[in-house]
Amino acid sequence: MLIVIKIGGALIAKNFDNVINDIANIYMKKKYKLVVVHGGGPQINELLEEMNKSPKYFKTPSGYTTRYTDQEAIKVAIMALGGKNNKRLVEAMQKHNVNAFGFTGIDGGIIEAKRKEKILVLVDDKRIMKRGEFSGKVVNVKTEVLNFLLDNEYLPVIASLAKSEDGDIVNVDGDRAASFVAKALNADIFISLTDVDGIYKNFDDKNSLIKKITSTQLKNYLA
């Protein structure tokens, strides 16, 4: 049985030891194969601030807040995701006798994404097209390397960076990356560890929290 676990950057910052202990306990039972996919938004911001740089966020016309990942920010994302977070997770798991193997989605071209070279944002209530964007949308996951690692009793730990169609490193949404990994590997269980309360029917209405939902109901909401 295979479990794919997504770890959000906020949990790496706040509940690191508990997350590692839980993963180690599952791994040591030898009943499940595990794959971990992680993000690192807070750590990207932390590194930017250490460099006296401010994270760049914009509102989209649809009302969402989005990170603007320019050439400078993607360099920091590589350090935060592929360096700091990934190796910290691997180190902690190894200390718990978990044979973790860490890498990013661009290694081996495992996670493929379509780069968003420009994004439409609101600046002073005006629609502006921001170019030079180094984020992407996951479109495919190659499984050969992952299956090799799993077959040899390694636990893959994947940072949510991906390879664009032109070979550029792009920052991708960790949740989407993890879901694509789970689908590509035909995972039996997908677990998302996050610091949010759950799914909201209307995000602005805190009383609209959905505590339990089936896959069919979720598809209807996303339709």
Model-derived segments and spans:
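Nucleotide/pyrophosphate-binding catalytic subdomain
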Residues: M1-A223
